[in-house]
Amino acid sequence: MSNPFDRVVCGDFAGPNGCPRRRGRQTYTRFQTLELEKEFHFNHYLTRRRRIEIAHALCLTERQIKIWFQNRRMKLKKELRAVKEINEQARREREEQDKMKNDSLKSAQQHHNSQKQQEQTIVGSQQSSGGGGGGGGGGGSSSLGSHLHHPSIVAQNDLKLGLGSMGVGVGVGGNLSMMGGLDNKTNQDILKARGSLVRESFFTVNETILRLRWTTREYVIVALFYPVAASSLLLKFRD
């Protein structure tokens, strides 16, 4: 088993023509490399005293320790430069992607605005073309609204209807009274029919008055034509 502190050292042997032979490249064992990396992790530069201690511990010369640290610092600078270039390239790519994204968003917004403007133009043209028909139909709606906003007209119509039914009841009663030649049973049936007609007419007018909101003038008109219904309405208002 080989000793981890073994090292290869090339001696200075005389070359051809008496020239000194060039020293070969120093090879480090795994243990030596790990110890040097550990020391470089904490200190990138070593003092002369620390170089002597490490050289004695790893069975290396002080010059070998110095050269190894110089090479390691150069390697670290190259690594940092490569990382910086990679980060710069990533930043440029990210900026390009953001720019493309912003351009796509702007184009989509412009397309949406153009579509919205076209829709508004179409709706405006349709409204302008349909304005004549809407104006023609406005007369019927206005007449209906005016009729609805004048409840007195409706009240007068209902009043005429109630009085008309009352007149029908009275007329029927007068015609029935002229039929004196009938027998008593027939006269009783006729009187019952007459009373029912009068009551129905009375309730019709009374309900009409209660259903509507009468003014003082309309109430006076009802009192003149039908005093019984007016008195009944007055009693209900007092209650």
Curated annotation (Swiss-Prot):
GO CC aspect terms: nucleus
DNA-binding region: 21-80
Species assigned in the record: Aedes aegypti
Protein family membership: Belongs to the Antp homeobox family.
Matching SMART domains: HOX
Entries under Gene3D superfamilies matching the protein: Homeodomain-like
Record-annotated membrane-spanning stretches: none
Basic and acidic residues bias (residue ranges): 90-104
A Pfam match: Abdominal-A
Keyword Nucleus tagged: yes
Function: Sequence-specific transcription factor which is part of a developmental regulatory system that provides cells with specific positional identities on the anterior-posterior axis.
Nucleus is among the record's keywords: yes
SUPFAM superfamilies to which the protein is assigned, alphabetical: Homeodomain-like (SSF46689)
Main location: nucleus
Organism classification: Eukaryota, Metazoa, Ecdysozoa, Arthropoda, Hexapoda
Protein name as it appears in the record: Homeobox protein abdominal-A homolog
Cross-referenced InterPro entries: Abdominal-A (IPR022132), Antp_homeobox (IPR050296), HD (IPR001356), HD_metazoa (IPR020479), Homeobox_CS (IPR017970), Homeodomain-like_sf (IPR009057)
Feature: compositional bias, Gly residues: 129-142
Gene Ontology terms describing biological process: anterior/posterior pattern specification; negative regulation of transcription by RNA polymerase II; regulation of DNA-templated transcription
Gene behind this protein: abd-A
Subcellular compartments: Nucleus
Ranges of compositional bias, category Low complexity: 106-128
Location of the region described as Disordered in the Swiss-Prot/TrEMBL record: 90-148
Molecular function terms from GO: DNA-binding transcription factor activity; DNA-binding transcription factor activity, RNA polymerase II-specific; RNA polymerase II cis-regulatory region sequence-specific DNA binding
Keywords: Developmental protein, DNA-binding, Homeobox, Nucleus
